[in-house]
Amino acid sequence: TLDTGANRDATWQYFGAPGKNVSFTVDYITWLYQWHEKQNWVKQNGTLTFEPFAGYAITQYGQPTYSLMADPIYTDQTIILTKTPENQGGMNGDNLFANSYMAPIDVKNFTPEDFTGDLEKTFYIFNSGSWNQWNGQNEKDSTLGGNGSTTPGQYCAIPALSAQYLDSEYDITTIPP
């Protein structure tokens, strides 16, 4: 859980860069974190260039709109999934990545062989939500881990071996235009 001191009703958006060469300046109303498997959530400050395919979380006061300009990515991307023996957050092996292509990634195209070593062969497709939603404050309304869960703050777990039997509802989507 990402607990930063921001209001616990703040809605977090999990996202990735919509391409390459995307710059962003973190202002005084924004909390921005990047996921690192070894360090967990790492706070981002100042002006930065988003790493394509890296996972980020953002929340802010109010509802500002951000415009991000990016160069499209047309090449294949290899993402190295890691499992550190121990880390400070106790969440070793949790890899979070985002789709930086301008088209969805169909989870049916992955096979168990795409997951190396003892990594869990499961996709977790998250729906953005608040800290309170993630910690069960709205538990009666949720279908935590259920197939097709669209409740904010919840996810859908898809075993890689089962992905070929699912419909396109379970694509890893791109950022909407």
Predicted regions and their residues:
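Charged, amphipathic alpha-helical scaffolding segments
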Residues: 33-71, 149-177
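Long, internal scaffold/assembly segments composed of regular secondary structure
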Residues: 90-177
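A short, polar beta-strand/turn micro-motif
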Residues: 1-28, 43-122
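Hydrophobic beta-strand positions in blades of beta-propellers and related beta-sheet-rich domains
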Residues: 30-39, 123, 131
